[in-house]
Swiss-Prot record:
PANTHER family membership: PTHR33453, RIBOSOME-INACTIVATING PROTEIN (PTHR33453:SF34)
Gene Ontology annotations of biological process type: defense response; negative regulation of translation
Gene3D superfamilies assigned to the protein according to its UniProt record, in alphabetical order: Ricin (A subunit), domain 1 (3.40.420.10), Ricin (A Subunit), domain 2 (4.10.470.10)
Organism from which the protein derives: Phytolacca dioica (Bella sombra tree)
Source organism phylogeny: Eukaryota, Viridiplantae, Streptophyta, Embryophyta, Tracheophyta
Enzyme kind, highest EC tier: hydrolase
Record's protein name: Dioicin-2
Record-stated family: Belongs to the ribosome-inactivating protein family. Type 1 RIP subfamily.
Active-site residues annotated for this sequence: E176
Primary location recorded for the protein, binned into one broad class: secreted
Length: 266
């Protein structure tokens, strides 16, 4: 498991954690214009496990997250409830997510185990609110972890809202920041702020365009610092259309990891 000590985290340890995560999910043989890419969705192991830790060994609270290596989807997580491993899985989670976060647990999902919605942003926001209003940073992540760890999941209103906020923050700080250096760097800039980094229009448009941007990069058949035509619908920080970028800009400032693409230029 890749461990991220949330309580004692700094911008530097956060960056190291994301580097470890990219290493764990990347295709060991392929690059595209000098950028690493995720492995295929068929390669085993299927998951990388991430432990988010709060507190010292004896009293440590640990959330274990199951992330698909091939697409970086968060499929579920576990904590400890009533002194036992409790898995929490989305309506559309992979069927093996349960045993991935709670090994050997063959119980049928009950009210303590079901996240009552799908893993899309739209579904999470229906319970947790608009993600542009939720700050991303050490303080916001730790506070949401404390609000749900070991708590009764049947407390529909409060638990559901807190859990959805935790998921929205964790997904963006972990999987999206692994995909996009742009998001990683913005989170680092506000890492210790009480409010954290509220995703700007550029970040939000990146989050829904990972495959499209990766494919636009892969389509460029000339090496060097080419101009890349970006997919339609991308916005910059000021909500203006963002239509082109140089390959160097994408490599150095925007992309942390591509989706798995077929690419002529390594």
């Amino acid at each position: 498991n890749i461990v991220f000590d949330v309580e004692n985290a700094t911008p530097e340890t956060y960056s190291s954690f994301l580097t470890s995560l990219r290493e764990a999910v990347k295709d060991k043989k392929s690059t595209c214009h000098g950028m690493i890419m995720a492995t295929t969705t068929t390669e085993l192991p299927k998951y990388v496990l991430v432990d988010l830790k709060l507190g010292s060994e004896k009293d440590a609270k640990t959330f274990t997250l199951a992330i698909r290596r091939g697409n970086l989807y968060l499929e579920g997580y576990s904590d400890i409830y009533n002194e036992k491993c409790r898995y929490r899985i989305f309506e559309d989670s992979e069927s093996d997510a349960q045993q991935t976060v709670c090994p050997g647990d063959l119980t049928l999902p009950g009210s303590q185990n079901k996240i009552p919605y799908k893993k899309s942003y739209q579904s999470m926001e229906s319970k947790g609110g608009d993600r542009t209003k939720l700050g991303l940073g050490q303080i916001t992540l730790e506070s949401r972890m404390n609000k749900i760890y070991g708590k009764d999941a049947t407390d529909q209103k409060q638990f559901q809202k807190n859990e959805a906020e935790f998921l929205l923050i964790a997904v963006q700080m972990i999987t999206e920041a692994s995909r996009f250096k742009y998001i990683e760097n913005k989170v680092k800039d506000s890492f210790d702020d009480a409010i954290g980094y509220k995703p700007d229009p550029k970040a939000i448009s990146l989050e829904t365009s990972w495959d499209k941007i990766s494919n636009a990069i892969a389509k460029v058949n000339t090496p060097g610092n080419s101009i890349v035509t970006l997919p339609k619908g991308l916005l910059d920080e000021n909500k203006k259309p963002w239509t082109t970028a140089t390959m160097d800009e994408l490599k150095n400032d925007i992309m942390g990891l591509l989706t798995h693409v077929t690419c002529k230029i390594k």
